[in-house]
């Protein structure tokens, strides 16, 4: 139902792809992109209206259906989600394995978030000893074939816990399963 749609983050990512050069003051070719807006997950943030959810199996079924319909014309996919209850612990998540399968089968590329750390204390840099593993990447950021994107701080203030160009305090870190380097890339965020 349209009542359960949160359009904030995906819209932001799409506009950054289309207009990122202009937003960052970079002169570049006037490229145009075609966007396919697939709302697979209901809104989970009560600040955006009614909330609902789906299970991982249902999400995988939706992704497979979408690939069957659009993968011949749309090759790059953004997946702005992370399953906080599934921190990378050295083994691959079911969703990470599934995304690898989908990318091979349909010759597509997924970009996924490394995930955000949403509970205090946030991580300093270098990480404090008591952080443990709770700031590790979350599913599906452990996909081997997906390009996992993390965040680095652009600015710093007198009371910042990280400096400019250090990993953002909320951005999750690798490694992935079998010590695979994750995130693959970082950009300024937060």
Residue positions per predicted region:
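Substrate-binding/access-modulating region of protease and related hydrolase catalytic domains
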Residues: 41-143
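Structural signal for hydrophobic packing residues in well-ordered secondary-structure cores
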Residues: 21, 67, 103, 157, ...
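Extracellular S/T/G-rich loop segment that most often corresponds to the catalytic His/Ser-adjacent loop
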Residues: 129-190
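Active-site-adjacent bridging/hinge elements
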Residues: 1, 34, 75-76, 190
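Generic recognition of flexible, low-complexity loop/linker segments
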Residues: 2, 23-24, 65-66, 98-100, ...
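Subtilisin-like serine protease catalytic core
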Residues: 1-55, 107, 142-145, 155, ...
